[in-house]
Amino acid sequence: MLRWLTAGESHGPALVAVLEGLPAGVEITTSVLGDALARRRMGYGRGARMTFERDEVEFLGGIRHGVTMGGPVAIRIANTEWPKWREVMAADPVPPEQLADLARAAPLTRPRPGHADLVGMQKYHLTDIRPILERASARETAARVALGTVAAAFLRQAAGIEVLSHVVAIGPVCAPAEPLPTPADRERIDADPVRCLDPQASAAMVAEIDAAKKDGDTLGGVVEVLGYGLPPGLGSHVHWDRRLDARLAAALMSIQAIKGVEVGDGFATARRRGSAAHDEIEAGADGVRRRTNRSGGTEGGMSTGEVLRVRAAMKPISTVPRALDTIDVTTGEPAKAINQRSDVCAVPAAGVVAEAMVELVLADALLEKFGGDHVVETRRNLQAYLDTLVVR
């Protein structure tokens, strides 16, 4: 079983992430993590923080000479802005007079619509939004991307599985559904300003972001994550919490601002008749196969061996420059929401985070099925399974 946790706040000294259950023998380095974290910062429409925030990452445990040792993998991602926030976010008590002249220390009392602010204050009996927004911030996703990068290395080295994402919609602009990108398109996708494979759609998306920025507004969109090389049989039909599609949906819905998930053709299948909704089976040169992949690579809660295809819908960023109406919780009077530094559109980055979450779920499912204390053992068990499939 693979388990992972993250800790840390947006303006704290660092984010910390722990991945437990990974086999020994997986090759991974801090430079690979750094490259992955840089991908998370890319995308047209990002805010000022992305231009000066850089991620200084290090392994704290579980790795020796670029190879996992079988113990928990611990990762630390430093916050280069920490000196500015040292007093405001200090773990130990700070004398009030030391905070009095710091604008950053002023209580935040105007909750932002669409954020965790208001309900977080209610739940945790707070009169200041700061403790809520610090942890609810999407800055936490840097830790998820780091963990997902380690999981991706395991998937690639143990099973040849590759996961990639691309943007299929920003605001009202949608990219063509076909062709699907492959791992060979990864660099081309990342080189695009909005991580969209279709040049015409990309240009229209950029224009839409420019228009939203001019209007003091924000945009959401849809990302698609694809998994190549999955064997049949990851997940299970026997219990709700072992179904692969359910685990993927939960993981994607856990990402900040994600409000919808679909697997394969998803909601479109609800508008079709059954004869046009399912994937018919035939014998191919390489064994049993499906003529189509409307299911998105899962049936009955298990991977089918076809390409995994999941989509996640991201709502527009809740911190709107043209501040939305709210109240000041100290007075109960109408007010404008606080306007923290933010992005116009973070959909391209959301795809990178979605990749990481899918990689973590697939790594967990692969270990659940094939086990292994060393990556060589996992690889051997997988090959033995494939060699002895009753129906192929």
Swiss-Prot record:
It comes from the Bacteria. One of its GO terms (cellular component) is cytosol. Its EC number is 4.2.3.5. GO terms for biological process: amino acid biosynthetic process; aromatic amino acid family biosynthetic process; chorismate biosynthetic process. CDD domains: Chorismate_synthase. It catalyses: 5-O-(1-carboxyvinyl)-3-phosphoshikimate = chorismate + phosphate. InterPro entries: Chorismate_synth, Chorismate_synth_AroC_sf, Chorismate_synthase_CS. This is Chorismate synthase. It comes from Acidothermus cellulolyticus (strain ATCC 43068 / DSM 8971 / 11B).
